[in-house]
Amino acid sequence: MMADEEEEAKHVLQKLQGLVDRLYCFRDSYFETHSVEDAGRKQQDVQEEMEKTLQQMEEVLGSAQVEAQALMLKGKALNVTPDYSPEAEVLLSKAVKLEPELVEAWNQLGEVYWKKGDVASAHTCFSGALTHCKNKVSLQNLSMVLRQLQTDSGDEHSRHVMDSVRQAKLAVQMDVLDGRSWYILGNAYLSLYFNTGQNPKISQQALSAYAQAEKVDRKASSNPDLHLNRATLHKYEESYGEALEGFSQAAALDPVWPEPQQREQQLLEFLSRLTSLLESKGKTKPKKLQSMLGSLRPAHLGPCGDGRYQSASGQKMTLELKPLSTLQPGVNSGTVVLGKVVFSLTTEEKVPFTFGLVDSDGPCYAVMVYNVVQSWGVLIGDSVAIPEPNLRHHQIRHKGKDYSFSSVRVETPLLLVVNGKPQNSSSQASATVASRPQCE
């Protein structure tokens, strides 16, 4: 190529790069120039901006000699929407064949495969890009892909999730001011939380990463997936006010995505049904309730009543039977409560298994049991003992509605004694988390 031609090609590429950068800036900073009310138009506006950009790129290219970089930029422009583009796949595949060291083309091609649902090929692209050059985009994308790879065993999936956290941390280390890296680290911790028995320390790390994403990058606050994923964690931790707020914000930012609205509605219905059942004690008639409570026996405490109870630290201890009304917020160590089930409530998500417990004429308490298999449950009239109950008082206000109740959180059915009997290990399952894979 002659010097003049080289200069011309360089000038063309600079112009193309500028057009593509402007297109991505339009998409990523959309809510800095538009209000949340315009959220429903965003996809259409981005599509129109993409078409305009492609037209301008054609004019700039003219009869200039096409090379890998130009193919990559055109493929990247086509890849700006959330949808899979076959044309982008063709252009980017050509670009990496012409210039295998072109890391950005590998990253873009990986994203195309990701949108196509071909997770294995996406993984190959991002891993391949990292062999050419360590870069934060490949690390971010690899972190996402690892959590979606098909595996033959739970152990293999756990290894992928741990690796996903590692890659996200590396991305953060490369640029601590990149909000996307922090957001992806939050998602990796979210998966780890559900994959390793819901350790509160890990949920705190997820929430901190999401907060950091918003702190370093204003655009992160406009990401509906961040709000939905954080709300999922809040819901599981029974911070219902924050969960409702998150679902509502995600729905406002992406009105055409039905999931946030559905999740907000489901949670509101759950809280409404729960508070109604708690107030009416499961609609149990006073005479029936007296008869149920009269049949409670010390034998119903099982191992919680004979000094055989083993605490989390492994030591055997005697628990003191106390009324529900005397419980303090938090874990009530050295205490056991015993009551009768007056209702149970299942949700579409099946988690938690919720039931109402009474032990006197006092109020009815919600008991929320996590990590249960679908076949497990308790029946109305069952006697249930809960050792070292973890109490929480809820005061929730959302969109003009108030919900107020007290609940006891039980991490596994194995902690409960039902009708004097400890629960079988087959009653326990582990929780999973679902996310919108192509939209991290």
Swiss-Prot record:
GO cellular component terms, semicolon-separated: cytoplasm; cytoplasmic vesicle; cytosol; mitochondrial matrix; mitochondrion; nucleoplasm; nucleus
Post-translational modification: Phosphorylation by ATM kinase induces nuclear accumulation while interfering with nuclear export, and phosphorylation by CHEK2 kinase enhances nuclear stability.
Pfam families reported for this sequence: TTC5_OB
Gene Ontology molecular-function annotations: chromatin binding; DNA binding; ribosome binding
Superkingdom to which the source organism belongs: Eukaryota
Induction field: Stress-responsive protein. Induced upon UV or ionizing irradiation (at protein level). Induced upon heat-shock stress (at protein level).
Positions of the record's site feature: Mediates interaction with N-terminal MREI motif of beta-tubulin nascent chain: 147, 225, 259
Impact noted for substituting residue 221 to A: Decreased phosphorylation. No change in subcellular localization in non-stress conditions. No change in nuclear accumulation in response to DNA damage. Impaired stability in response to DNA damage
Cellular compartments annotated: Nucleus; Cytoplasm; Cytoplasmic vesicle; Mitochondrion matrix
Short sequence motif Nuclear export signal: positions: 13-24
TPR repeat start-end pairs: 7-61, 68-98, 103-130, 136-174, 179-216, 224-253
Keyword Iron-sulfur: no
Region spans: Mediates interaction with 28S rRNA of ribosome-coding tubulin: 285-287
Chief localisation class: nucleus
Keyword line: Cytoplasm, Cytoplasmic vesicle, DNA damage, DNA repair, Mitochondrion, Nucleus, Phosphoprotein, Repeat, TPR repeat
Tissue expression as described in the entry: Expressed in heart, brain, spleen, lung, liver, skeletal muscle, kidney and testis.
SUPFAM superfamilies for this protein: TPR-like
Positions carrying Phosphoserine: 203, 221
InterPro entries registered for this protein in UniProt: TPR-like_helical_dom_sf, TPR_rpt, TTC5_OB, TTC5_OB_sf, Ycf3/AcsC/BcsC/TPR_MFPF
Domain notes for this protein: The tetratricopep-repeat (TPR) motifs may function as protein interaction domains.
Assembly and binders: Interacts with JMY and p300/EP300; the interaction occurs in the nucleus and augments the association between JMY and p300/EP300 in response to DNA damage. Interacts with PRMT5; the interaction is DNA damage-dependent and promotes PRMT5 interaction with p53/TP53 and subsequent methylation. Forms a complex with HSF1 and p300/EP300; these interactions augment chromatin-bound HSF1 and p300/EP300 histone acetyltransferase activity, resulting in enhanced heat-shock-responsive transcription.
Stated role: Cofactor involved in the regulation of various cellular mechanisms such as actin regulation, autophagy, chromatin regulation and DNA repair. In physiological conditions, interacts with cofactor JMY in the cytoplasm which prevents JMY's actin nucleation activity and ability to activate the Arp2/3 complex. Acts as a negative regulator of nutrient stress-induced autophagy by inhibiting JMY's interaction with MAP1LC3B, thereby preventing autophagosome formation. Involves in tubulin autoregulation by promoting its degradation in response to excess soluble tubulin.
Protein name: Tetratricopeptide repeat protein 5
Organism encoding this protein: Mus musculus
Lineage, uppermost ranks: Eukaryota, Metazoa, Chordata, Craniata, Vertebrata
